[in-house]
Design a protein with these regions (language model features):
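Conserved N-terminal structural module of periplasmic/extracytoplasmic solute-binding proteins
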Residues: 2-9, 13-87, 287, 325-326, ...
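Short amphipathic alpha-helical coupling segments at ligand-binding clamshell hinges
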Residues: 39, 43, 221-222, 304-317, ...
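Extracytoplasmic "Venus flytrap"/periplasmic binding protein-like
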Residues: 50-109, 145-146, 150, 246-247, ...
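Extracytoplasmic/periplasmic substrate-recognition and gating elements
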Residues: 52, 269-331, 358, 365, ...
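Hinge/lid segment of periplasmic solute-binding proteins
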Residues: 82-134, 162, 277-281
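Extracytoplasmic/periplasmic substrate-binding proteins
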Residues: 87, 191-195, 199, 220-306
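Helix-loop-helix "hinge/cap" segment bordering the ligand-binding cleft or interdomain interface
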Residues: 118-188, 202-236, 369
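Conserved C-terminal helix/tail region of periplasmic/extracytoplasmic solute-binding proteins
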Residues: 334-384
């Protein structure tokens, strides 16, 4: 009897061991700044529930272990969550599976978003989320200066530069600038980039996001506009984004130029405590259209033994209702706005951002004209 029992226990142990060994290990790479930790965690948990036959492990860049290092080290993840430009470097090498058949709602998605996910007429990435920046407005401060009519979204869905000037001048007369900007630095210059793109519709990048066009005449006009308002005292300068945000939340300024998805939740206590009636506005633009500077995050499927399961998971993220709730306001859907790609956080993007920041600071300080500063950026980009 003991021998039979021992044999049964051994059989059970072997069976359990085989079951564990049979589970596929699936690695999901999240690039830096691709997705906040809470969202990534919720997405992974939902994936584990939907695909229990695999062990799902989230990995991120640590030290030098970014996507490039993983690929060159023959340690390719199964799913890659990153900006299109980070993944596009490897598309021609055949490292990713074509995902054309996985996208069932392409007609609803903004064309520039889809264009960013296509290379050589192949969809190499499924779009997940797009981050958009906008301005936060203190409605009560506008009403106090008899400019509450500009907070009417029906009559003023967007402000033209001339209207924006009137607002800035009204607050400057009261010695309380409506808007503050901070030093242009690669980590915090996204709002300046978005403002300069929106003012006259000049894009830092071509529509697909692959090529820099920093010396675009409309970018130059926008930088001249910003320089003149700073020199004239209509726009104030502070030391950091955090300082400008604190002034807005304290009710000291009417506008904050870098309001992002999630800021209302993060700042809810201060907004309520200080009685700020918040509304959001797109950046002012002479085009008459809302200009959306967007930063896209998507998912790629690596070619390999696990690609079938990885492809199912990627499609699941794009369609499952609970996955949609985890992703939140995805920001990829088609509307009447003009969409312009924001400079991404890849090495190439960071180079452009550093050059852009140097050009902005040079122009604002009077060290060079906007035209000369931007021409230097473009010359450097062309030489790369």
């Amino acid at each position: 009897m003991k021998r039979v029992l021992a044999a049964l226990l051994l059989l059970c142990a072997v069976t359990m061991s085989a079951g564990v060994a049979a589970q596929t290990q699936m690695n999901v790479y999240f690039a830096a700044n691709a997705m906040d930790e809470e969202t990534a965690g919720a997405l992974m948990e939902r994936t584990r529930q939907a695909f229990p036959q695999a062990q799902w492990r989230a990995i991120g860049p640590t030290g030098e272990r970014d996507l490039r290092a993983l690929i060159l080290g023959d340690d390719m993840p199964d799913l890659i969550v990153c900006a299109p430009s980070e993944a596009s470097l490897w598309v021609s090498d055949g490292l990713f599976i074509a995902l054309d058949g996985c996208l069932t709602d392409a007609s609803r998605i903004s064309e520039p978003v889809l264009d960013a996910c296509v290379q050589d007429e192949t969809l190499f990435m499924l779009p997940l989320t797009a981050k958009h920046r906008q301005m936060a407005v203190n409605r009560r401060l506008l009403e106090k200066r008899r400019m509450g009519y500009m907070a009417n979204a029906i009559e003023h869905p967007i402000w033209y530069p001339m209207e924006f000037d009137q607002l800035l001048e009204e607050f400057a007369l009261a010695d309380h600038p409506a808007l503050e900007i901070w030093p242009a630095e690669p980590e915090t210059c996204g709002a300046l980039e978005a403002l300069l793109q929106a003012l006259y519709g000049g894009a830092w990048l071509t529509e697909g996001g692959e090529t820099g066009q920093a010396d675009h005449i409309n970018v130059q006009a926008a930088l001249e506009w910003l320089r003149d308002r700073v020199r004239g005292g209509l726009i104030a300068r502070v030391g950091s984004r955090e300082e400008a945000l604190a002034h807005f939340l304290n009710g000291e300024t009417a506008l904050f130029m870098d309001w992002q998805t999630g800021d209302e939740r993060r700042c809810a206590r201060e907004l309520e405590k200080n009685g700020i009636e918040l509304l959001t506005m797109p950046y002012p633009s002479s085009t008459g259209f809302v200009i959306r500077s967007f930063e896209l995050t998507g998912v790629c499927v690596a070619a390999g033994a696990n690609s079938a399961l990885a492809m199912r998971a990627a499609a699941f993220w794009h369609e499952d209702a609970q996955a949609q709730r985890a992703l939140g306001e995805r920001g990829i859907w088609k509307d009447d706005a003009v969409w312009l790609p924001e400079i991404d956080a890849t090495q190439k993007g960071l180079t452009l951002r550093r050059l852009m920041c140097e050009a902005i600071e040079s122009a604002l300080s009077g060290e060079s004209t906007p035209k000369d500063a931007l021409r230097l950026v473009q010359t450097t980009l062309d030489a790369m």
